[in-house]
């Protein structure tokens, strides 16, 4: 188990090709001076300064998690206290998950007690700069009933003046297995963080403060049979943001504060069935509704609204997997996605897997990814543009993996080529003054990723990974070379 409060540092070390930014001892923040930008293979990293992550999708139990107005993930909301494990798909996954899954997908699978009993864990840590992190978790399993309750409090003064960060929140999940084949569960997560941004050393800020509340709740009914399984689920995410954009030395304090309320709700259904030997067919449908309101609240009582907008997405998809021979599997899928502003997008994907002797496998895949423009890009703040079209890319990938020595040794190598268009960037307005969001950017990336791990015994293991990335049009927060190596020790309570 990780002692980090956020899942991002763990992914930074263990996933080749993934990179996220950070700014201090603890916390990422939002808006001006924020970090927590994420990229996979150079997708998701901002093409220009001050743009958020929008090309990489974060999920919790398969449900998309992003700010309803801005369309970007909130890094401080993805805490290890709720995570049983984190699944990462490198490369486009839009055929299953839709918009934003261009560079890949991070899926946080929430905790659940698997065996009967009661387990309680308390973690307390302290460090320099007045840093404290605490977490308490209680998990129960009694017959068909299960529950998980977690609370945490973390704070730091920061390594610079005016860089304090404080966060507290809780997570609860209840589940009940009606039968061996049907189960239901629901959960809720609420976190509150207060952050301060001091600006850069050369360009400091005064009173650049944030008070952010994020919440999510979901409900799912699942079925699991020998030849079919599926789920019907509902989720609702919300956020309340209060931001003082601050001022620079010699300037005047702002006479207003930025406020926003955003929401995202959705209903998802899928069913997977084995029609005959070596076959798996999955069909599914999604409905998403997202949006909110943003305004500047002035001290004299009046307010100026910058956005009050909601949009909808409806999609259906199918994925077909078939063993053609003992050594060959075909996987093909397609999604039709309708957005209430930008219209319909068709997303195909196809792949082949070659099963070789000695637990070796070669995979070849071609997949399309896309991202719809956000409400911020279309309707909020100059240079907004309501005529924007979706960003699109194609990813071509070849991979090799193998497990040896009773699975104690594992290694893999991926090579990929990505080509995309319609990247949304700010350029001079061709029909007027100022800047305008336009579909003028291009993506052409290629690279390689390698990973290796070895389990000496139940106590000791080692792992390493490396990624190389070439970008014809470089973006921020996407390093060319990334290397990690680690030694793991786990025994009893240690």
Where are these regions (language model features)?
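Short strand-turn segments of transmembrane beta-barrel domains in outer membranes
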Residues: 105, 109-140, 150-151, 156-163
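Short acidic/polar hinge/loop motifs at secondary-structure boundaries
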Residues: 8-12, 55-56, 63-90, 433
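Transmembrane beta-strands of outer-membrane beta-barrel pores
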Residues: 124-128, 142-144, 153-157, 190-194, ...
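Membrane-embedded beta-barrel scaffold of Gram-negative outer-membrane proteins
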Residues: 144-145, 227, 231-245, 292-293, ...
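Extracytoplasmic beta-strand/coil segments of soluble accessory domains associated
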Residues: 11-63
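Gram-negative outer-membrane beta-barrel transporters
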Residues: 323-326, 415-419, 438-494
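Repeated loop/turn-to-beta-strand initiation elements of outer-membrane beta-barrel proteins
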Residues: 144-148, 181-186, 225-231, 278-281, ...
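Flexible loop and strand-edge segments within Gram-negative outer membrane beta-barrel domains
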Residues: 156-163, 167, 181-264, 303, ...
């Amino acid at each position: 188990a990780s002692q980090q409060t956020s899942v991002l540092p763990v992914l930074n070390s263990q996933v080749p090709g993934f990179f996220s930014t950070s700014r201090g001892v603890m916390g990422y923040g939002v808006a001006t001076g924020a970090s927590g930008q994420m990229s996979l293979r150079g997708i998701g990293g901002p093409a220009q300064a001050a743009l958020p992550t929008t090309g990489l999708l974060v999920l919790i139990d398969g449900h998309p998690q992003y700010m309803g107005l801005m369309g970007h993930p909130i890094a401080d909301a993805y805490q290890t206290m709720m995570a049983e494990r984190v699944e990462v798909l490198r490369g486009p996954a839009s055929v299953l998950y839709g918009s934003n899954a261009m560079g890949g997908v991070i899926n946080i699978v929430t905790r659940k007690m698997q065996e009967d009993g009661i387990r309680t864990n308390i973690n307390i840590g302290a460090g320099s700069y007045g840093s404290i992190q605490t977490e308490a978790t209680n998990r129960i399993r009694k017959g068909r009933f299960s529950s998980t309750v977690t609370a945490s409090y973390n704070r730091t003064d920061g390594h610079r003046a005016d860089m304090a960060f404080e966060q507290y929140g809780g997570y609860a999940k209840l589940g009940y297995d009606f039968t061996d084949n049907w189960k239901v569960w629901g959960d809720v997560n609420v976190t509150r963080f207060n952050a301060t941004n001091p600006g850069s050393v050369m360009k400091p800020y005064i009173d650049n403060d944030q008070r952010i509340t994020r919440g999510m709740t979901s409900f799912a009914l699942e079925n699991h049979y020998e030849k079919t399984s599926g789920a019907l689920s509902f989720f609702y995410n919300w956020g309340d943001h209060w931001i003082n954009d601050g001022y620079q030395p010699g300037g005047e304090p702002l006479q207003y504060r930025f406020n926003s309320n955003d929401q995202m709700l959705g209903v998802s259904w899928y069913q997977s069935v084995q029609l005959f030997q070596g076959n798996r067919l999955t069909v599914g449908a999604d409905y998403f509704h997202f949006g909110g309101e943003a305004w500047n609240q002035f001290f004299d009582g009046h307010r100026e609204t910058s956005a009050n907008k909601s949009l909808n997405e409806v999609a259906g998809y199918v994925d077909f997997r078939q063993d053609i021979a003992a050594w060959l599997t075909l996987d093909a899928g397609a999604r039709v996605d309708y957005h209430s502003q930008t219209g319909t997008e068709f997303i195909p994907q196809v792949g082949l897997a070659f099963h070789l002797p000695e637990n070796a496998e070669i995979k070849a895949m071609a997949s399309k990814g896309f991202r719809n423009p956000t409400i911020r890009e279309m309707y909020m703040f100059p240079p907004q543009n309501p005529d924007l079209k979706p960003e699109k890319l194609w990813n071509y990938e070849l991979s090799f993996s193998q497990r040896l020595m009773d699975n104690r040794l594992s290694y893999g190598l991926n090579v990929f080529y990505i080509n995309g268009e319609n990247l949304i960037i700010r350029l001079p307005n061709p029909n007027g003054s100022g800047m305008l969001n336009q579909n003028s950017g291009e993506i052409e990336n290629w690279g390689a990723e390698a990973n290796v791990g070895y389990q000496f015994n139940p106590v000791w293991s080692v792992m390493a990974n490396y990624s190389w990335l070439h970008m014809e049009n470089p973006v921020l927060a996407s390093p060319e070379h990334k290397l990690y190596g680690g030694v793991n020790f786990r025994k009893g309570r240690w």
